[in-house]
């Protein structure tokens, strides 16, 4: 159990009841009582020291971001979502109470992700390419004989989520942010959201399967395993 007050939005009892599939895994491989890396502590806005507490706080924040999106009566079109400004705004609004740098593009190397100087151009290219592909399918083009319209749209969204993680635009929170982003696009273009491995009830197993799928995609360029996991 975490140590937040009962009425605090990060208190475990408040966010365990949330219906959204976002309380699965954080950005660190080892959690539990493991301490947050020292270099990350200086950027935290919360009085926490353990990765478990950080994971809980990030999960609560992203759940709130889902709730805000659900309550939004007039959704923007997909072109308005696919901008660097919106990408940064979504991350900032999701994690602003946790990290000083929420919404700010990464400026130092991490163990995954492109070089910091490439983030802006790679992210813009991905956003523009995703917009172009969605436009083609929405207009009735961009389909092949072996896939339906929805299958093609889901492939585009799955590839989008995977490449967001691959670019790793932010210091932390990229996984949850990428899934929220893809879910918002799914709502706007009116296709079913991915379940993001929810059928795998064992959370460590769910996370491990996702990591295996990401490694396969990284090494081969084939996102089939990632799409299969995302649909479970």
State each model region's role.
Residues 1-232:
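FIC/Doc superfamily catalytic core
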């Amino acid at each position: 159990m975490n140590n937040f007050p009962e009425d605090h939005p990060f208190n475990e009892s408040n966010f365990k009841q949330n219906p959204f599939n976002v309380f699965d895994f954080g950005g660190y491989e080892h959690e539990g009582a493991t301490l947050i890396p020292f270099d990350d502590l200086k950027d935290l806005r919360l009085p926490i020291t353990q990765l478990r507490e950080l994971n809980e706080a990030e999960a609560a924040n992203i759940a709130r971001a889902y709730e805000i999106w659900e309550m939004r009566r007039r959704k923007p079109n997909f072109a308005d979502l696919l901008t660097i400004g919106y990408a940064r705004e979504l991350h900032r609004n999701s994690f602003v109470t946790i990290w000083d740098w929420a919404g700010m593009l990464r400026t130092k190397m991490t163990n995954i992700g492109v070089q910091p100087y490439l983030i802006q151009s790679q992210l813009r290219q991905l956003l523009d390419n995703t917009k172009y592909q969605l436009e083609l399918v929405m207009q009735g083009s961009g389909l092949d004989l072996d896939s339906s319209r929805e299958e093609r749209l889901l492939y585009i969204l799955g590839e989008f989520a995977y490449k967001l993680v691959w670019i790793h635009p932010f210091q932390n929170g990229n996984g949850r942010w990428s899934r929220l982003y893809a879910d918002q696009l799914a709502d706007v273009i009116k296709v079913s959201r991915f379940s993001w491995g929810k059928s795998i009830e064992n959370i460590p197993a769910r996370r491990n399967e996702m990591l295996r799928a990401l490694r396969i995609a990284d090494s081969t360029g084939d996102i089939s395993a990632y799409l299969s996991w995302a649909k479970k």
